[in-house]
Amino acid sequence: VETWTVETDDDGSRLEVHSFRPAQPTGAEGNKPAGGSADNTGNSTSAKADPATVTAPGVVVIHGTLVTDALYRPFARNLSLLLSRPVHCYNRRGRAGSAPQPDDYSVQTEVGDLAAVMKATGSEDVVAHSFGGFVALQAARDIPLRRLVTYDAAVSLSGNLHHRWRPELEQAVTDGQLNHAWAHLVQGLATAGPLSYLPLGALRMLSIMSARTTVGAEMRELLPTAVKEMRAVLDADAELADFTQLATPTLMLSGGWSPGYFADTGRQLASAVPAIDFAVVPGQLHEGPIRPGKRLAIRIARFLNGTDGTITPQGRKRRRA
């Protein structure tokens, strides 16, 4: 994995990027990544890799809420091997190695950051999970993407996610009651499987226990970013008509064991937008992209390569027998 930074176009903030590339032929010095990192103009700066040496179009992976890109690196590595193309993860704002969320943070902050990463990496395709799927679908309305895959995209349509917002979550974060905040978030979003339906007291105890693990402690630290991200989703509440002009061939996936509202959103968008197709991935939880195994990566790679038979290059769905 190569670690480097991208400079954003708005305020010169930096985003930490981790890149996986297909093996380069040996003996060709000009094809080896150069030392140094790169800003969004491709100029070398100060880390470990220069993306300008790679000519194949890349894929950008956008992570979800309460996590960093570290959990997605095995998935990104598998996808790079399957596609024989570079795949790039980046830490969104508020994570170590990247700039903090600004005071005026919104979905446009995230869309601008994605555009900067795509420009710097020479990427054309996007794979996005949960909140990342929300960002990617908003971006596809404004910036050119070749192909897009989302998994459990957290898009608010006609206010369908507003009842999942818990004001107690924001208040608990403000008061520093992180175990209480985590419990409200899990109950509200229902993304933790059967655990989501436990009483608040039991969820608080689970939060205390999970804080002893690296991932659990990291999730607690990221709770303030989750508040701003959930606000951004609700503030960008949309209608189906807002997406009808989307032309990027898009595959929206949802896990068979994910909360049902993700699939409901995918089905609604696929029924209204010719460029969007939807499918359920049996046996997968909401955390599908960060769980072990290659099955999901294979499904996504086939779509990105245009070999799965779902959508034609013109973005129109094929008739199925």
List PLM regions with ranges:
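Short beta-strand/loop motif that positions the catalytic acidic residue
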Residues: 246, 252-254
